[in-house]
C-alpha cells in the first residue's frame, strides 16, 4: 500500500525570469497532495472530484505569472489516522510535497495536523470539520477551509430553535467529527434554554439505523440532530422516512451535501434543513465553476470539492506572493489581507487558521418544486462569517497566547 494512486503534472508556460522566480521553490515545483478517501464513504463528496478541483486551481493559477510549476499528487487515507499520518510523513520526508489539501475525516485531519505542525509543509484542511483544528490543536502551518463543527452545529441549532425545536436527540458518528458536532451544538442548545434528551452513537459507514431511530423516537425530542456526515446521514434520513418519524419529529443534518440529497432523493429529503458554505447554483461564479467541473465529472461539485479548489488556489497565490513554498512564509501570506474568493465570496483567514466566510442555511425542496436534476436547495438564510464561526478569543488556540 503506497497511498499514492495518481500523479498529475500541470506545467505553466515558462516566462522570462523563471529561474529567479523559482529560486525559493523547493525542487523547482510546488507539489500539492490531495489526501482523502478514494473508495470509501467519502469518495463521492471528495475522492476523485477533489483531484479534479485541485487541478482546476492549478490551471487557473497558471504559474502565477512567474512560471511556477505545480504538480498534484493523490493519496488514499482509507479513513484511518495512522495511514493518513504515514502518507503525510512520507510526502514530507521523501516525496517533497509542499502542501496537503482536503482530508475528510476529522481523526485523520488531526493526525496530519500533527505531522505538518513543525515542518515546512502546509495543511489546507478544506474537509476536516472538527473545530478543535483551530482551537486547542491549532497550528501555524494549518488553514481550515469551508466549515467546522462550531459553525454547522450552532447555526443549524439556532435556526431550528427559532422554529420551535427546543428538545433534541443526537445520532452521532463515533469519532472526532461526531463528538465535536454534538458538543458544539449541544452547548448552544442548553445555553439557550433547550434540552438534549439523549444521544446514540454509531460507527462510520453504518447501514442499519433502526435501533438508533427507535431510541430517538422514544425520547419524544422535537428534533433529531444528525451529528454525522455522508453517507451515514443519508442512510439515517431514508430510514427515518420509512419509519414515519418525520411526521412528529424534525430532522437536522449538520454536515450533508448536495450529493447526499441526490442519492436519497427529494421524496425522502424534502423539508430537511442543512448548512452549506457553497452551492453550485448560488450565483454566476458558482455556476460557471460547476459547469467546468461537470464537464469532467458528470455532475456538480460538492462543497468539499469546491473548498479544495479555493484553498489550493489561495495557497498557490500566496506562494507566488511570498516567493516560497515554505509554509512558514506562505501561510502568513495567506492571512495577510481579506480577499474575494470566487466560490465563497468575501473571505479572510484568522491567526488561528480559521477561514471566515458566509454560511448558508438551506431547505431541501419538495419534488414538485425542483426544476430538474441537482436543483435541490432553497436558500433560507445567509449567516455572516463573523456570526457563524467561533470568536477568535474563545477557541483556546495556543498561537494567541
Model-derived features: positions:
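Leucine-biased recognition of intrinsically disordered, low-complexity hydrophobic segments
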Residues: 4, 14-15
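Extracytosolic ligand-binding ectodomains
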Residues: 2-4, 8, 21-401
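N-terminal signal peptide c-region/cleavage motif recognized by signal peptidases
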Residues: 16-20
Amino acid at each position: 500500500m503506497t497511498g499514492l494512486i495518481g500523479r498529475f503534472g500541470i506545467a505553466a508556460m515558462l516566462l522570462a525570469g523563471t529561474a529567479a522566480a523559482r529560486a525559493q521553490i523547493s525542487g523547482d515545483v510546488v507539489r500539492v497532495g490531495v489526501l482523502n478517501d478514494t473508495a470509501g464513504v467519502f469518495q463521492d463528496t471528495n475522492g476523485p472530484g477533489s483531484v479534479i478541483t485541485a487541478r482546476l486551481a492549478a490551471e487557473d493559477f497558471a504559474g502565477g505569472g512567474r512560471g511556477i510549476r505545480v504538480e498534484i499528487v493523490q493519496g488514499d487515507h482509507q479513513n484511518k489516522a495512522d495511514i493518513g499520518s504515514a502518507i503525510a510523513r512520507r510526502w514530507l520526508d521523501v516525496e517533497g510535497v509542499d502542501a496537503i489539501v482536503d482530508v475528510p475525516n476529522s481523526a485523520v485531519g488531526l493526525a496530519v495536523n500533527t505531522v505538518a505542525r513543525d515542518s515546512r509543509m502546509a495543511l489546507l484542511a478544506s474537509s476536516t470539520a472538527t473545530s478543535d483544528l483551530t482551537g486547542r490543536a491549532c497550528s501555524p502551518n494549518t488553514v481550515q477551509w469551508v466549515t467546522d463543527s462550531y459553525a454547522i452545529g450552532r447555526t443549524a441549532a439556532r435556526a431550528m430553535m427559532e422554529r420551535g425545536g427546543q428538545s433534541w436527540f443526537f445520532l452521532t458518528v463515533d469519532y472526532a467529527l461526531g463528538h465535536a458536532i454534538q458538543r458544539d451544538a449541544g452547548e448552544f442548545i442548553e445555553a439557550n434554554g433547550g434540552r438534549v434528551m439523549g444521544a446514540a452513537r454509531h460507527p462510520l459507514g453504518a447501514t442499519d439505523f433502526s435501533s438508533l431511530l427507535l431510541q430517538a423516537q422514544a425520547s419524544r425530542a422535537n428534533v433529531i440532530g444528525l451529528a454525522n456526515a455522508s453517507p451515514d446521514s443519508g442512510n439515517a434520513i431514508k430510514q427515518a422516512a420509512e419509519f414515519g418519524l418525520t411526521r412528529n419529529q424534525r430532522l437536522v443534518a449538520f454536515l450533508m451535501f448536495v450529493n447526499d440529497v441526490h442519492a436519497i432523493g427529494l421524496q425522502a429529503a424534502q423539508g430537511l434543513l442543512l448548512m452549506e458554505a457553497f452551492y453550485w447554483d448560488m450565483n454566476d461564479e458558482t455556476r460557471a465553476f460547476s459547469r467546468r467541473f461537470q464537464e469532467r465529472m458528470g455532475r456538480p461539485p460538492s462543497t468539499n470539492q469546491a473548498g479544495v479548489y479555493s484553498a489550493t488556489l489561495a495557497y498557490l497565490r500566496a506562494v507566488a506572493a511570498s516567493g516560497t513554498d515554505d509554509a512558514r512564509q506562505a501561510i502568513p501570506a495567506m492571512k495577510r489581507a481579506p480577499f474575494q474568493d470566487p466560490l465563497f465570496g468575501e473571505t479572510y483567514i484568522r491567526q488561528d487558521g480559521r477561514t471566515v466566510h458566509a454560511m448558508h442555511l438551506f431547505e431541501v425542496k419538495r419534488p414538485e418544486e425542483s426544476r430538474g436534476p441537482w436543483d435541490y436547495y432553497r436558500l433560507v438564510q445567509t449567516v455572516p462569517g463573523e456570526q457563524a464561526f467561533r470568536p477568535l478569543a474563545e477557541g483556546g488556540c495556543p498561537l494567541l497566547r
